[in-house]
Amino acid sequence: IISAISAIGMAIGTAALIIILSVYNGFDSLIRSMMSTVEPDLLIIPSTGKVFVPEGETYDWIYDQPSVKSMCCVLQEQVFINYDGKQGLAKAKGVDWVYEDESSLKEYITDGEFKLHRGDIPLAVVGSGLAYEMQINPRFLSGIEIYFPSRTRKISLANPASAIEAIKVWPAGLFSVNTDVDKELMILPIEKMQELLEYDNEVSGVEIRLTDEADTKELKRLQKEISRQLGPDFKVKDRFQQNESLYKMMRYEKAAIYMILIFVIIIIAFNIFGSLTMLIIEKRFDIETLRSLGATDKLIKRVFVLEGW
């Protein structure tokens, strides 16, 4: 009975290790797939400062690579928004037409449509968490007013509002990716963000998305070559580096779960070893009797294996 209980304990511990790690790997893959919706395979940002002008032969070289699916410019900033009298903060991300055509975010639209232009009217898609907080509805006619302090004008005590830049966009749709993204992100045309931030052709980053056939080796090759061509003035980050703290936390959690379950299995193994040791000590006189009758060590082992349950 002791041996059976010990064996069952070992089986349960091993099964728990396999099941829990499998479930965790599933969640890990799900989170990575969701994050890939809003994060590119590679992101080019300046080493110093917030914006740059994406020009030069390097960008032509990137565009010509067969493993590159799309390359788009983005301009991102924390802004103040107002919608029907409700105020709040948001992360406004201006994107170009390539993002509008190629982004997989349209698969996560929960209301309305993924559209950034309707004729000359600028539109925006908003995270469901932010939309819930601000009561934003793509079916309403109200626009979203976006404000940001002017970079070029000084604050006037007589008229402080003159130092605030403002634009207006209309909500076209709501998306839901994950809680952290949904509660703060809104996407709008990059030309409206450049107007708000008083930039001409400057962007905060260039997002590069690879084809489905591109593997990790190809991604690392591109990252290394782009970094070499652009030099120290720019950083080229993969998805892990873009969310280093999140992925490190997931890796540490997985390692911690693995170590805890391995520790449990080791304890169960010692329990089995102790149980068998006690069983042999208890049966040592029976073993001597069997040996006196001519039983070999092999036969005695078989007796313990067959009758030890």
Positions of PLM-derived features:
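Peri-transmembrane interface segments
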Residues: 1-4, 212-270, 279-281
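Short, strongly hydrophobic transmembrane alpha-helices
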Residues: 2-26
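Short, solvent-exposed hinge/capping segments at secondary-structure junctions
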Residues: 104, 126-141
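Basic-flanked hydrophobic alpha-helices used for secretion and membrane insertion
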Residues: 139-233
